[in-house]
Amino acid sequence: MSKRNPLERYRNIGIMAHIDAGKTTTSERILFYTGVSHKLGEVHDGAATMDWMEQEQERGITITSAATTCFWKGMAGNYPEHRINVIDTPGHVDFTIEVERSLRVLDGACTVFCSVGGVQPQTETVWRQANKYGVPRLAFVNKMDRSGANFMRVREQMISRLKANPVPIQLPIGAEDKFAGIIDLVKMKAVYWDDASQGTKFEEREIPASQQADAATWREKMIESAAEASEELMNKYLEAGDLAVEDIKQGLRARTINNEIVPMLCGTAFKNKGVQAMLDAVLDYLPSPLDVPAIKGVDENGLEDERGPSEDSPFAALAFKIATDPYVGQLIFFRVYSGTVKSGDTVFNPVKGKRERIGRLLQMHANQREEIKEVGTGDIAAAVGLKEVTTGDTLCDPNHVITLERMDFPEPVIHVAVEPKTKIDQEKMGIALNRLAQEDPSFRVRTDEESGQTIISGMGELHLEIIVDRMKREFGVEANVGAPQVAYREAIRKQVEIEGKFVKQSGGRGQYGHVWLRMEPNEAGKGFEFVDEIKGGAVPREYIPAVEKGLRDSLSNGVLAGYPVVDVKIALFDGSYHDVDSNENAFKMAASIAFKDGMKKASPVLLEPMMAVEVETPSEFMGNVVGDLSSRRGIIQGMEDIPGFKVIRSEVPLAEMFGYSTILRSATQGRATYSMEFKHYSEAPKNVAEAIISKK
C-alpha cells in the first residue's frame, strides 16, 4: 500500500499545559496554518474547533482530547509534506487521565507555558506524566504579549521546578505590548509575522542591534548543546568554533529525542506569532514513529514480545479513548503501532478474548470526520462498530496475538450519590452511567449495598459535575445529586499473626478451611500484596488462589468505617486442611475471617486524601489566603513572587476544600485563582478520624 507520507514524515504530537496557558488557542492556530480550518476559532467566543463538546464551549476549557490530522510543509514551504496528528489535551487537573492516555500513544509533545504564570501545578503534573512515558518535548512560551511576560523566568522555573534542561532556540523581540517577533538562533535571523494576513506571511530581517550580543551568547549555548549529541559534532565544533545549520538541527534533534534537552520557543498564539515556527520545530526536533523504541507487550504464552513500526509486521494497535458521537455512535480512538487494518477486517482484543469486526474507519478533524478505507503504522484514527473495547485494550491480528502494556488509571478521590428524578429515568441512568464509565476509566459507578444508592466516583468536583451534565444532555437523564463525599481509606500500622478457621461438619459433606496469616503495613502507594509462604503442603496448592481471593474481596470493607483497605502485605504461612471437607469456598471464608480479626488487632488507621493546592493571589490578600488555608488544616509549603501577585503552595486535606472557590473569590474580590490536585493519602488526625467513624 502506498502512503501519501512515508513514516519518517509522520509526527504524533500532543499539546499539553496548565489550564489557561493558551493550549487550545495554540492548537487552533496549528489547524489554521496547516490549512484545515479557514476561520480562526477563539476559545473566548466559544467557537474553538478542538473544543467540540457543548460543556467545553460553555466553560472555555478542554475536557476530551480531540485528535486531528493535518499536513505541513514548513513556514516557508521548504520541507517535504509532513503529516501531523495533533492531540489537544485538557489542562484541568480533574481530567489528568485524558492527558495520561494521550501521552501513552504520542511520540512527542509541545508543552505550552504562560509567559507570566510560568510553571504551574498542572504543568508539573503533565511533565511528570511525560517523563513516565519518556515523551520528548518542546517548550512553547505563549502569551509573550501579556503584561508581566518573561521568557527567561520561565526557563529558570523549568530548571528549578521541572528539573528540565531547556535550550532556547529562539529569543523574543520585545515583550508585553512591545512583543514584535522572534530571533531564530539557528539561522541567526529576526522573524516578523504580518498582522494583516493573520500571520500566514512573514519576513526575515537582520537581528536588532540592541539584541545582537544577547543572541550571540544564547546561540553559543545552543550550539554547545547540539555538539554534545555526538563525538563527530563535538569535533566539528571544536575545530570550526561553529556548526552549520543542518548540524545544529541534527544535534538538537538527537538530544531532544533522547530526552536530554527541551528546545524552547516563544510567541503569542492569540496574536498569530510564533506558532508557525513551532510547527517547523515539530518537524525538525520531535520524533517520527521510526525514532521511538518498538512497543512492548506479551504474546499469548505470556512471553515478552515487541512490535516495531513497520507496515509489513502484523497489525497491533492500542485503543486509548472512547467517545460517543451523536451521529455515528461509539467511536474507538486507536494508535496503530505496526501493520495495517482495513474497514471490514476482523481484529482480536486479547484483553477481552474477543474477535470483533471493524465497521467504518474515520480520520478525525476535531468533531468533523472523514471516512477512510485503511489505516497503517503510525496512524491515529477512530473505528466504529467495536462493541466490547474499553480504554487501554489492545487490538491485533487474530493470527499474531500480542497484548500491549495497559495504562494505569488513578483511583477516584471523591464520590457522590445520584438518584434519578423519575422512574422513567431509572433505567436510562444505568445505561448512561455505564456508557460514560466505559469512556472514562477514572470515573467509577457502584451501588451501595446498604442504602441501595448509586454512587459515582471521580477525580474532583468538576469531573463529576460534567458527568452529571453529560447524562442530562446526551442521554436525557435528570438526576438529583447528593453532597460530595471524600474517598477515605483504611490501613494498618503494626504487624500481627492471625488465625482464621471456617469449619462446618454436621453430617454429610462439610466445610473445612484453616489459615494462619501474617499481616503487616506495606509501603505507601504499594497497595495490597499477597505472599505465599506455605511449605510442605499445609495448605494444598489448589486452595491458595482461594485464600488470596478471600483477602482481596475483604479489602473493600475496612473495620473502622467500612472504607477500602490499602497498603497491606499479607503472607499465608501455615494452616491445615481436611481430605473430604476442604474446598475453595471454605478457604476463602477462613481468609476473610482472619482478615477481619487481624485488621482489628493491627492498629487500624483512617487515611484521607491530601491535595496539592496552589493559590495565585494579589499580594494584598496574601494574609487572608494563608490564614484561611491554615484554618483548613493546610500546611504551607512555599511562596513565590510574580509581578503584583504571590503564589502560595500548600497541602490541604480534600475534606476541607469543598466550596473553596466561592470562599476564595469573596476573600480576594474575585482576583485570586487556584488549582488543586491529588497528592497522596495521609493518616487523618485522631479527632477527625473519630468524627468520621462516629458518622458511619
From Swiss-Prot:
Subcellular location per UniProt equals: Cytoplasm
Keywords assigned: Cytoplasm, Elongation factor, GTP-binding, Nucleotide-binding, Protein biosynthesis
Positions contributing to GTP binding: 17-24, 88-92, 142-145
One Gene Ontology biological process: ribosome disassembly
Chief subcellular location equals cytoplasm
| Protein's UniProt keywords contain GTP-binding | yes
Q: What CDD domains would the database entry show?
A: EF-G (cd01886), EFG_III (cd16262), EFG_mtEFG1_IV (cd01434), EFG_mtEFG_C (cd03713), EFG_mtEFG_II (cd04088)
Superkingdom of this protein's organism: Bacteria
Q: Which residues form the tr-type G domain?
A: 8-290
Q: What does the protein in this record do?
A: Catalyzes the GTP-dependent ribosomal translocation step during translation elongation. During this step, the ribosome changes from the pre-translocational (PRE) to the post-translocational (POST) state as the newly formed A-site-bound peptidyl-tRNA and P-site-bound deacylated tRNA move to the P and E sites, respectively. Catalyzes the coordinated movement of the two tRNA molecules, the mRNA and conformational changes in the ribosome.
Protein name according to UniProt: Elongation factor G
